[in-house]
A protein has these predicted regions:
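A generic structural signal for short, solvent-exposed coil/turn residues
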Residues: 50, 76-78, 105
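Conserved mixed alpha/beta catalytic, RNA-binding, or beta-rich assembly cores of soluble enzyme
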Residues: 2-48, 65-69, 73, 107-119
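Short glycine-rich, basic-tinged beta-strand/loop micro-motifs
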Residues: 49-63
Length: 119
């Protein structure tokens, strides 16, 4: 059988202070996961072995891809076989400095999770 897409889910994560790409990536991944329930994995496709019959691909979009660590996503979703790619994207608007804090960068990451099943 061939792998086919079951789900494409999007998540947004924001690091409000300091522009940390990986904090924003983790929040975006959690956001995407919290928006879906894949009952069809077991009830429709009768998947018994998630590690051989499913896979996940993550597209990670951040303003500074050179600072991004894709293992943030793969470690968080370690109960699935997963691969991840980092792309230029997201947003980094200027934030507000409090009490003279020079770190004013806001980082917004987008994570797109695509779940495939062997169907």
């Amino acid at each position: 059988m061939a792998f086919k897409r079951l789900l494409i889910e999007f998540g947004q994560g924001v690091d409000m202070h300091g522009g940390n790409q990986n904090n924003a990536i983790l929040k975006a991944t959690q956001d995407a996961v919290h928006h879906c329930c894949m009952a069809g994995i077991s009830e429709v496709f009768e998947i018994k072995d998630r590690m051989t019959q499913t896979k996940v691909h993550a597209d990670i979009y951040v303003p500074h891809p050179e600072q991004a660590d894709p293992s943030v996503v793969t470690n968080y979703l370690d109960w699935w076989p997963i691969d991840a790619e980092v792309h230029q994207g997201g947003a980094d608007p200027r934030g507000i400095a409090f009490d003279g804090d020079p770190e004013t960068e806001i980082t917004i990451a987008i994570v797109v999770l695509t779940v495939y099943v062997d169907a």
